[in-house]
Amino acid sequence: MRTKIEALFISDVHLGARGVNAEKLIEVLKEYDPEYLFLIGDIIDGWLLKKRFYWQQTYTNVVRKILSYSKNGVKVIYIAGNHDEFLREFLGVDLGNIEIHNEYVYKNIFISHGDLYDGVVKLKWLGLLGSIGYDFAIYIDRKLKKIGFKRSLSKFLKNKVKEAIKFITSFEKQLVHQAKKRNCDTVICGHIHHPENKIIDNIKYLNCGDWIENNSYIIYQDGEFKIHYK
C-alpha cells in the first residue's frame, strides 16, 4: 500500500542526461500517494537533447508514471527550469490534471526552480557549455568509480564552471528574498543540486537536490517537510 502524503517535491531529474537514477525515482513514485506532485524544473534536459539524443526506456517509464499520477487524480504542478525552459511557452496551460508554471505559490510556500535568480545561468551560453561538460564528466565518473576512484569529477567541474564567472551571487538569499516579497514563510527550489533544509532570515529554505548524484526529494505532510534520499 502506498503512503498517503499531502505533497511530493522533485527537481533536477535531467532525463536525457547520462547517469540519471531513473529506477530509484520510479521506486519513489510507486511508494507515495500524494495529493500534489510538484516537479520543480529540469525534469527533462532539453539542452542536452538538442545536442545529442540520449534516452533510455527507464526515462520513458518515469514519464509514464508521472502521467499515471495525473490520470489517477494527483494534481501535478510542473515548474519550468533552465534545462526545460521550452515549457515556458506553455505557462498557465492546464493539461488535464497537469499545470505548467514559471513559479508557484502553494499555501504559504513559494516554489521556483531557481534559475531566474542565478547570475551564471542568466548567461545562457556559459550555462550550456557547463551542461555539456557536466554530462561528459558524469560519464567519466562512472568509469572512474569502476576502478575505485572516489572523487567526483562532475562535482568538481560544476563548481569550477560556477567560479569561472567573476560574479558572486547568493542563491539561497535571493530565493528567500523572493519568498518574502510574496508573503511566504517557506521557499522550495532546485537548480543547484544541493539538498538543503534550513532557516534563513526566518524563512524556511528547502532545496530538492537532484537525481544524478543525491537521489533526493521532499515530502510534505501534517505541516512538516522532510528530505529523503533513495
List the model feature ranges, each with a label.
Residues G96-H101, Y106-K107, D115, V120-G127, ...:
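Conserved beta-sheet core of the metallophosphoesterase superfamily
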Residues L15, I44-D45, L116, H194:
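Short active-site segment of divalent metal-dependent hydrolases/proteases
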Residues E6-H14, L48-R52, F156-A164:
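Short, basic, glycine/proline-bearing loop/turn elements
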Residues T3-I5, A17-Y106:
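Core catalytic region of metal-dependent phosphoesterases/phosphodiesterases
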Residues S112-F171:
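Active-site-proximal loop/helix segment associated with metal-binding centers of metalloenzymes
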Residues I10-S11, L37-G41, K75-N82, I111-S112, ...:
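Active-site neighborhood of phospho(di)ester-bond hydrolases with catalytic His/Asp-centered motifs
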Residues M1-I5, H228-K230:
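Short, Lys/Arg-enriched, disordered terminal segments
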